Regions:
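The feature captures the beta-strand-to-loop junction immediately N-terminal to the Walker
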Residues: 36-38
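ATPase nucleotide-binding modules
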Residues: 227-250
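ABC ATPase nucleotide-binding domains
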Residues: 76-79, 83, 87-230
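Conserved coupling/switch loops of ABC nucleotide-binding domains, chiefly the family-specific signature
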Residues: 57-60, 210
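Conserved ABC transporter NBD signature motif
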Residues: 59-67
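A short, flexible loop at the N-terminus of ABC-type nucleotide-binding domains that lies
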Residues: 1-6, 11-22, 70-72, 105
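Helix-to-loop junction immediately C-terminal to a conserved catalytic motif
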Residues: 51
Length: 250
């Protein structure tokens, strides 16, 4: 498990137009942090810079107390789960899950033990001989999560992993991810635009708009004690009603 710290981060895909502006937050070991906001607010960009896939223009990133701005992605011990599953279509579920261990030159018996163990934990042990085309979307996502977790990363990044699933399956996997987090105690940074998902899963929520943090807090804090009008109107269904007044009510 890793502790993550970001200080005054600026980043973007064009130097003159930063996507992220003065981003600062920390993630404690074993915490489940959800980055929440509308499309284009910068939440996936944060995930990508934590993983080392885009450079940091300014500011500092620390993983377990070590400055990691220029640390190559392969040396960060981070795993990532994507929206589109990203499974190898010609490989079975077993081979997909085993791939990162084979790439790291684990012994064959250790690979077999690790793959079967995580498969049982995620309820996919009966799918190990199937290829992705023979599995449902939910089953493929479980395999993708198993592949990410099998090498015991210190930090797990999840980029809208449930957004391609139907409502019923999304609810089921949401519960399973929460249960899995409790059982393995991993440090997780999770991206979503779905407020129900964020409020259900998060230890704390980081709510973003236009590349800037609007509020950081527990689900209870951001819902019942919004820091500004944006947070108040973004959360809740139906949305709250706003009105203007010239009088201050004591």
């Amino acid at each position: 498990m890793s502790k993550l710290e970001l200080y005054n981060i600026y980043a973007g895909y064009e130097e003159s137009k930063p996507v992220l502006k003065d981003i600062s937050f920390f993630v404690e070991k074993g915490e489940f942090i959800v980055l929440l906001g509308t499309s284009g607010c910068g939440k996936t960009t944060i995930l990508n810079l934590i993983a080392g896939m885009i450079p940091i223009s300014a500011g500092e990133l620390y993983i377990d107390g070590v400055k990691s701005n220029d640390t190559p992605p392969r040396k960060r011990n981070i795993a990532m789960v994507f929206q589109n599953y990203a499974l190898y279509p010609t490989m079975t579920a077993y081979e997909n899950i085993a791939f990162p261990l084979q790439n790291a030159h684990y012994k064959k018996k250790d690979i077999d033990s690790s793959v079967k163990s995580i498969a049982v934990e995620l309820g996919i042990d009966d799918l190990l001989e199937r290829k992705p085309a023979e599995m449902s979307g939910g089953q493929q996502q479980r395999v993708a999560i198993a592949r990410a977790l099998v090498r015991k990363p210190s930090l797990l990044l999840m980029d809208e992993p449930l957004s391609n699933l139907d409502s019923a399956l999304r609810n089921q996997l949401r519960f399973e991810i929460k249960k899995l987090h409790k059982s393995i105690g991993a440090t997780i940074v999770y991206v979503t635009h779905d407020q129900a998902e964020a409020l259900t899963l998060a230890s704390r929520i980081i709510l973003l708009s236009n590349g800037m943090i609007q509020q950081i807090g527990t689900p209870h804090e951001v819902f019942y004690e919004p820091a500004n009008e944006f947070v108040a109107t973004f959360l809740g269904n139906p949305k709250i009603n706003l009105f203007t007044s010239n009088n201050l009510i004591a």
